[in-house]
Amino acid sequence: MQKIVRNRLIKIILCFCSTCLGISIILYNLEKNIIFFFPPSKINEAEQGKELRVGGLVKRDSINRISANKISFVITDNIKDLEILYQGVLPALFREGQGIIAIGQLSDNKFIARQLLAKHDENYRPPS
């Protein structure tokens, strides 16, 4: 009887330790994805020199086309503004007042984006 209880206890402890180890590995690997993006007002909290995601609304009258595929614009969270420089093809949903997420690095108070993601609104409208 004593041997059965001890074996059961060992199995329970091993299962508990395995579960804790698995959860720890998952959380460690998801660490940089826990905060999906920083708004312009919180960009100072992000690590400098690392790739970041910043998100906000494209400010009205801020889009400036530098060349055919190079653009600068300002995003805002209605607290602080941040200038974004991007070279590449713009997403189809990109426009003033639209929510976007830019992936890139911060350099001299300007954000150099390597990728833009346009956010659509949450309201579903069936085709008419």
Swiss-Prot record:
This is Cytochrome c-type biogenesis protein CcmE. Keywords: Cell inner membrane, Cell membrane, Cytochrome c-type biogenesis, Heme, Iron, Membrane, Metal-binding, Signal-anchor, Transmembrane, Transmembrane helix. GO terms for molecular function: heme binding; metal ion binding. Residues 30-128 are periplasmic. Belongs to the CcmE/CycJ family. It is found in: Cell inner membrane. The keyword Heme applies. Gene3D superfamilies: Nucleic acid-binding proteins.
